[in-house]
Amino acid sequence: MEKNWFFPPHDGIRLGDLADQIGAELLDATAADRAVRAVAPVYRAKAGDVCYMLSRKSREELQTCSATAIICDKAISSLVPDTIPVLLTAKPHTAFALAGTLLHERAMRPSYNTSERGVSPGAFVDSTARLEAGVEVEPMAVIGAGAEIGSGTRIAAGAMIGPGVRIGRDCTISAGVSILCALIGNNVIIHPGTRIGQDGFGYAPGPTGGMIKIVQVGRVIIQDHVEIGANTTIDRGTMDDTVIGEGTKIDNLVQIGHNVRIGRYCGIVSQVGIAGSAQIGDGVMIGGGVGVNGHTSIGSGAQIAAMSGVASDVPAGERYGGIPARPMRDFLRDVAEMALRSSERQKKKGGKDE
């Protein structure tokens, strides 16, 4: 990659210091004073870069690697050339993530859109809104009546913070975000285009046909350290609250319906749709493109495979997949059986489709 001015390299961290901070062991102590400035993939890592390996599949990439260090576990360390220092750890993925936060702090949150600091004269801040010292508001942002925003929070260009919304400290609200009827904790990151707190989808049959809108008078509660991807939508509750638990990470293009409650430290990948009043426990992982039926429950620690359809409750700690979602062992057995039947059918037809 040619020079990347969006994310310039760090001024330099001693390799020995980096090892200490990411919880890794530097196998070659003589390399401790070398400077690390950036992260890079194995195949093009050069002096000043640190990279990581999780699999032997990357061993061919070592032929073009001249990194200052490679983060890996004991099983992979024997593949690394003697010329490249090893940062040994049982959790290389985690260690690399920590290295990234140290070397590229600027990339950990959406970047500033202007060079201005403070409240831009091009923003509209209602006279009854309360902003603590250190809040930054970029041009064309709107802060509604009675809104409260904590110190260190940045409201990016074109964002709309509705009346009475409360946002905690050290949050990043990116460009084009709209937030209504919501209480947001500290250290929350919301990426561009996300919509929070709009009406949930609820209608009843009309007395003479058509549909009558069901009133939506709940809120959205987003706890501390949540990160929400671009163009995700989170509806407010009907009468209760929609809740996103502490530390949960939500990808781009996720739809979360009214009254949904998501626990702490969950991971939800893009294009997931969670229908109203579903209950998600703590530490749940949901793969891309999953649909979750309304009023269902997914227990803590459960994992849902990508493209699955959750039609009924999932017990805690289970791995489910398929449509309808079922225990992974059953899903894989069903897939194998269907493949076998398809193969047998083709043989009966002489390999010709009809």
UniProtKB/Swiss-Prot annotation:
Catalyzed chemical reaction(s): a UDP-3-O-[(3R)-3-hydroxyacyl]-alpha-D-glucosamine + a (3R)-hydroxyacyl-[ACP] = a UDP-2-N,3-O-bis[(3R)-3-hydroxyacyl]-alpha-D-glucosamine + holo-[ACP] + H(+)
EC number, UniProt record: 2.3.1.191
Pfam families recorded: Hexapep, LpxD
Keyword GTP-binding carried by entry: no
GO cellular-component term (any): membrane
InterPro entries per the UniProt record, alphabetical: Hexapep, LpxD, Trimer_LpxA-like_sf, UDP_GlcNAc_AcTrfase_non-rep
Active site: H258
Catalytic class of the enzyme: transferase
UniProt superkingdom: Bacteria
GO molecular function: N-acyltransferase activity
Gene Ontology biological process terms, A to Z: lipid A biosynthetic process
Annotated metabolic or biological route of this protein: Bacterial outer membrane biogenesis; LPS lipid A biosynthesis
Family matches, as CDD domains: LbH_LpxD
Keywords: Acyltransferase, Lipid A biosynthesis, Lipid biosynthesis, Lipid metabolism, Repeat, Transferase
NCBIfam families reported for this sequence: lipid_A_lpxD, PRK00892.1
HAMAP family: LpxD
Subunit comment: Homotrimer.
Function summary: Catalyzes the N-acylation of UDP-3-O-acylglucosamine using 3-hydroxyacyl-ACP as the acyl donor. Is involved in the biosynthesis of lipid A, a phosphorylated glycolipid that anchors the lipopolysaccharide to the outer membrane of the cell.
The family this protein is said to belong to: Belongs to the transferase hexapeptide repeat family. LpxD subfamily.
UniProt name for this protein: UDP-3-O-acylglucosamine N-acyltransferase
Organism listed in the record: Sinorhizobium medicae (strain WSM419) (Ensifer medicae)
